[in-house]
């Protein structure tokens, strides 16, 4: 009886975990830091490395804006209104609340395309800096 009870107690968390409720995320997150800027503002700095990444889940940033800098490789964005490829030492800016990601017209990058990105975002302290949309 003791073994049965112990087995049930250990198994419940495994059964109860709902994988479908996991939040979407960006691939290849290497590091993420938050810096207090004062006046209830923070700066999020993320570094990402990924390969064969044509797009991201649909989302927006309720932040003052987002700067994405390509440290190495090739990435792409539609922030200018049409798709553009960005390579090493180039960057783009994403305005606040711009819904993007998951676009049907996202171009495929060639197989083996890798990117190293530095993402800098200023947001209000205590608020989400990225909101994923189902």
Please describe what each predicted stretch is.
Residues 51-66:
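A short beta-loop-beta micro-motif enriched in histidine and acidic residues
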Residues 38-45, 88-91, 112-117, 122:
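Flexible, surface-exposed loop/linker segments and immediately adjacent secondary-structure boundaries
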Residues 37-40, 49-50, 79-99:
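Short acidic-glycine-tyrosine-enriched beta hairpin
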Residues 5-8, 14-44, 85, 93, ...:
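A short, N-terminal "cap"/entry segment at the start of jelly-roll beta-barrel domains
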Residues 55-57, 76, 92-108:
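Histidine-centered metal-chelating micro-motifs
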